[in-house]
UniProtKB/Swiss-Prot annotation:
Necessary for the introduction of cis unsaturation into fatty acids. Catalyzes the dehydration of (3R)-3-hydroxydecanoyl-ACP to E-(2)-decenoyl-ACP and then its isomerization to Z-(3)-decenoyl-ACP. Can catalyze the dehydratase reaction for beta-hydroxyacyl-ACPs with saturated chain lengths up to 16:0, being most active on intermediate chain length. It comes from Bradyrhizobium diazoefficiens (strain JCM 10833 / BCRC 13528 / IAM 13628 / NBRC 14792 / USDA 110). Its EC number is 4.2.1.59, 5.3.3.14. It is found in: Cytoplasm. This is 3-hydroxydecanoyl-[acyl-carrier-protein] dehydratase.
Length: 173
């Protein structure tokens, strides 16, 4: 299990995806190709818009990323749902990083707006989540607002991203 740090490299993220970071049965990132960022550049529990925590991550855009080959033929664009999933991944990572126990599941969001797209010629995607609230009861629930920028232009905004950590035997419903 890694010590709590304020940044993580790709190999660290892969260790998290293998279940080696937060302990057995606890939060994991997905393995590639569904792991949607290359590094976490900042994570803390007192920053962000609401002063309750922040996670910032980056994806280096390359024309050979897997989704460009299939979405869409002769019109490659990163699927919007993958950027949204990255934001949920980051909230789940934050919950594990902050000591929450259980397996992570995305539970929804209240609002999502797209105002641009990620194309193969882009250089870098930056993801940001600002933690609004963490509740620790039967399950651990994180609520955050987030955004995605491509080459320094914000193109997605998400409000009230919800992720829960569920211990074995706890139902989603």
């Amino acid at each position: 299990m890694l010590n709590r740090r304020n940044g993580y490299e790709y190999e660290d993220l892969l260790a998290c995806a293998r279940g080696e970071m937060f302990g057995p049965g606890n939060a994991q990132l997905p393995l590639p190709p569904m792991l949607m960022f290359d590094r976490i550049t900042d994570i803390n529990d007192n920053g962000g818009e609401f002063g309750k925590g922040l996670v910032r991550a980056e994806l280096d855009v390359k024309p050979d990323l897997w989704f460009f080959g299939c979405h869409f033929k002769n019109d490659p664009v990163m699927p919007g749902c993958l950027g949204l999933d990255a934001l949920w991944q980051m909230v789940g990572f934050y919950l594990g990083w902050s000591g929450g126990e259980g397996r992570g599941r995305a539970l929804g969001l209240n609002e999502l707006k797209f105002s641009g797209q990620v194309l193969p010629e882009a250089r870098k995607v930056v993801y940001n989540v600002d933690i609004k609230r963490v509740m620790r009861a039967k399950l651990v629930l994180g609520i955050a607002d987030g955004w995605l920028s491509v080459d320094d232009q914000i193109i997605y905004r998400a409000k009230d991203l919800k992720v829960g950590l569920f211990k074995q035997g706890t139902s989603l419903g």
